Amino acid sequence: METIAAIATAQSPSAIGIVRLSGEETRRVLAALFTPASGMAVEALPYRRMTYGDIRSADGTLLDRGMAVCFSAAHSYTGEESAELHCHGSPVVLSEVLQAAFAAGAQQARPGEFTQRAFLNGKLDLTEAEAVIDLIDAETAESARNAAAQLSGALRRPIESVYDKLLDVSSRFYAVVDYPDEDIEDLSREETERTLLCCEETLSDLLGTFARGKVLKNGVATAIIGAPNAGKSSLLNALVGFDRAIVTDIAGTTRDTVEEKATVGGVLLRLIDTAGLHETDDLVEQLGVERSKKAVEDADLILALLDGSTGLSASEARAAEMLAPLELAAKSGKPWLLLLTKSDLGGGAGIVPDKDWRTPEAIISLSSVTHEGFDALEAAIRTLYPAPKGDTSLVTNARQADAIRRALDSVRAAKDALQSGMTPDVVLTEVEQAENALGELTGRTAREDMVARIFERFCVGK
């Protein structure tokens, strides 16, 4: 394959920037750019040892002084001869070094091409390749740890274990189909059934992590609802750490949904500040209220706010208005927290409504001004969305979940066929379908267009 080059670090002023090379002509391209200060020839540079020297353009112009390091195919990221040039992190300098590499014969790397070559050369499977981009995009420490575990094979290992077991089953049934006169079926039926049951349990457990994994990767869609002036926008601003939403003493300031991300208790929340839920003749406010209700339908978690400074001691009409959002949350079927806001203003007598509703996961008194109660809010959210234990990896994307689901369905069908006494070829067909689904997951049997789509998500240089 042709030798490729790209800038591997962010193109903004920094102490260090890196240009990567990979391919058969890596040493030749590097020799055209880099002159070791020791006088040693680039071809003689030892692997995995940093060497100081000059970095020059094709016409000999000094571009920078920096370090070069070479990697053998056996010990490189891509599985090919590779090298890195470490220079000062000026975008201008990095661009000139990259252009010099092109002048020496290297080609511009496509997005994700380094990782794609690692996959093609057997350094990574597809689950590990996907973990690379997940690690780059991680927005919380927990999502970064999950991606790191997946990159180290935490998802690959149980999938490979199931795949190997299924291969053993299919080999047994091929023997039965190919040699029908041999007494093989009865000897292996009970063991085969146990094997399929073990595979079913493993795949079911993996698929069961998808709901949590999806939330871990994309964040918890969290609707903040309440009556007008209940403190919704103030809470949003306090959680994100800056004034994202306009806050005034005028009820109905927020007329549309406002979205922002925040990490609360180590959990990524996609916060949706909604318009106050109330009856109104104003057309714009009506649209805002409808969007608020839609946000509740789409949410994973609901934060229902009640003005804790007045509670339900207001007029009957106002009390009904304040209760409406709580009723919506309680009847949504979603996990919800009742937040009694404005605790810094006192009050709060007779706050909690005595209604025959599904109780909230927690009732928390808090202040968006003093941050009183925020520790309790973080603890409640962490209880709802606990961190994965140990080095296990959660399934985090729809491609992985779909492949596991199809494999699980086929394993169950094979087990049912075996228990029903159906012919070996029927069982074999289902087992092979499960193998193919798992092969797509790891990349053994993945289509070229699907593989290309995965690597299109990567940045250039990775």
Where are these regions (language model features)?
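Conserved beta-strand segments of alpha/beta enzyme cores
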Residues: 107, 268-270, 362
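A glycine-rich (often HGG/GG-containing) alpha/beta subdomain
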Residues: 1-145, 149, 153, 329-332, ...
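Glycine-rich, N-terminal phosphate-binding loop of Rossmann-like dinucleotide-binding domains
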Residues: 21-22, 87-89, 239, 274, ...
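Alpha-helical scaffold elements adjacent to nucleotide-binding pockets in ATP/GTP-utilizing enzyme cores
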Residues: 29, 100, 295-298, 376, ...
